[in-house]
């Protein structure tokens, strides 16, 4: 059973109103000091049953004024096992999952044993190249000349965001890995992706 909670920011605002009416001393952002435990009581009801089945919880938190350090998203980040940070990408005009601000405490378990052996290396290479594109975009905005590599990372980032990070994308893990290999092959040389040669030999799109 999947439980979707929306919007936890509104819930916290309601807690703040009740707390103020009770003349309790507010904490950061006028939120009651009990916010952490109030949220934990809800989020930590997620459970996996020994006999099978689970109750996962997905909570939606709207950022107050776009501030990720606000008390609600800040406390949520400490309690939950991971967050998907959504933002609008102006380059492709879609809402995407931001890989830099998203977090998974389970990511270290991606070893390729339950998915595909190239999974961890493809994941790390894609994020590194996407970060290189962000640096190239900063250079361009500041009026610096771009190298050929910079231009290729920018083109890669647009396709990567459109084909993999956009929230309207619906692919399984194998399909995502194959699409990413296709983008690697389209924009880079094998040595630029910094992935083991045996994996490159197996998956590089000729």
Tell me what each language-model feature is.
Residues 1-205:
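P-loop NTPase catalytic core
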């Amino acid at each position: 059973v999947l439980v979707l909670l929306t919007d936890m920011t509104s819930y916290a605002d309601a807690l703040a109103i009740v707390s103020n009416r009770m003349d309790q001393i507010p904490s950061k952002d006028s939120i009651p000091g009990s916010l952490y435990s109030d949220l934990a009581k809800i989020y930590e009801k997620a459970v996996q049953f020994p006999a099978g089945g689970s109750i996962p919880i997905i909570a939606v938190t709207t950022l107050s004024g776009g501030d990720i350090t606000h008390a609600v998203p800040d406390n949520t980040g400490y309690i939950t096992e991971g967050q998907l940070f959504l933002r609008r990408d102006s380059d492709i005009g879609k809402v995407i999952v931001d890989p830099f601000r998203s977090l998974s405490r389970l990511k270290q378990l991606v070893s390729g044993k339950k998915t595909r052996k190239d999974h961890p290396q493809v994941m790390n290479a894609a994020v590194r190249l996407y970060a290189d594109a962000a640096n190239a975009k900063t250079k361009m905005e500041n009026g610096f000349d771009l190298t050929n590599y910079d231009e290729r990372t920018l083109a890669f980032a647009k396709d990567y965001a459109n084909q993999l990070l956009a929230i309207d994308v619906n692919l399984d893990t194998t399909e995502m890995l194959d699409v990413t290999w296709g983008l690697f092959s389209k924009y880079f040389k094998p040595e630029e992706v910094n992935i083991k040669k045996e994996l490159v030999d197996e998956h590089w799109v000729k």
